[in-house]
Design a protein with these regions (language model features):
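Structured, amphipathic secondary-structure segments that form assembly/contact surfaces
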Residues: 1-10, 16-37, 41, 51, ...
Length: 188
C-alpha cells in the first residue's frame, strides 16, 4: 500500500527584525525563465544604483537611474537631487558618507511588477559604527523599444524602464552596525 499523503518539505526564511517570512525555493532546471532572469537582474541593478550613495560613483548611479526610469518616476528621482531639496541625499549626507545597498529578495507576482526587499548600510568615514535600515520597494517596469543614443544603449541594452517606484521602511528605527576597523566592512 502506498501512503495517501505526500510530504513536501519547504524552507521558510524569517527576517529577524521585521518578521517577514518567505518560502525559499531551490534552483531547479527550468524554474527561472530567461525573461525573468533578465528582469530580476535589471531590477536588482536599478535598486542598487538608486539607493546607493557614494561620492565616488554618484554621477554614474544618478545617470543610470535616470536613464532606467520613465515619466513621473524619472521626474521624482531628478527632483530628489535638486538643490534646496531637504530630502536630497546631497543635503542629508556629507560627501564622506557611504550608503551601500544589499538586495535580499526579489518577488515578481506578475509580469511588469516586482517587490524588492533590501538593506542599506550607512557608514560615515572614521566612524566605528553605522546603521542598517531594511526596506521594501514596489516596482512596476517594462522593456521599451524606443530609440535611444548608442552610449545609452550600452548601459541599457534592452530598454528596461521603471514606471513606478515606491520605497517603504520595514523597521521603525535603524539597527546599529559595527565595522571591522581593518577592512571597513560590517561585522555580522
Amino acid at each position: 500500500l502506498a501512503p495517501l499523503k505526500t510530504v513536501v518539505p519547504y524552507t521558510i526564511l524569517v527576517d529577524r527584525q521585521s518578521g517577514y517570512a518567505e518560502t525559499i525555493k531551490g534552483l531547479a532546471p527550468g524554474a527561472l525563465t530567461q525573461d525573468n532572469a533578465i528582469a530580476q537582474a535589471a531590477i536588482v541593478q536599478y535598486v542598487i544604483a538608486r539607493e546607493t550613495f557614494d561620492a565616488s560613483d554618484l554621477r554614474a548611479n544618478y545617470e543610470k537611474t535616470a536613464l532606467w526610469s520613465d515619466g513621473p518616476t524619472r521626474a521624482a528621482y531628478r527632483h530628489l537631487f535638486q538643490k534646496g531639496n531637504p530630502d536630497s541625499p546631497l543635503t542629508r549626507y556629507p560627501a564622506t558618507t557611504i550608503v551601500s545597498t544589499t538586495v535580499k529578495s526579489v518577488t515578481m507576482p506578475r509580469t511588469g511588477s516586482a517587490t524588492v526587499r533590501f538593506d542599506t548600510i550607512r557608514h560615515d568615514q572614521g566612524a566605528a559604527g553605522g546603521e542598517r535600515r531594511s526596506w521594501t520597494a514596489v516596482i512596476d517596469y517594462r522593456f521599451s523599444g524606443a530609440p535611444m543614443r548608442m552610449e545609452d544603449r550600452f548601459v541599457n541594452p534592452l530598454g528596461f524602464q521603471v514606471t513606478h517606484y515606491r520605497r517603504d521602511a520595514e523597521d521603525t528605527a535603524p539597527t546599529p552596525v559595527q565595522f571591522d576597523s581593518a577592512l571597513g566592512v560590517p561585522t555580522r
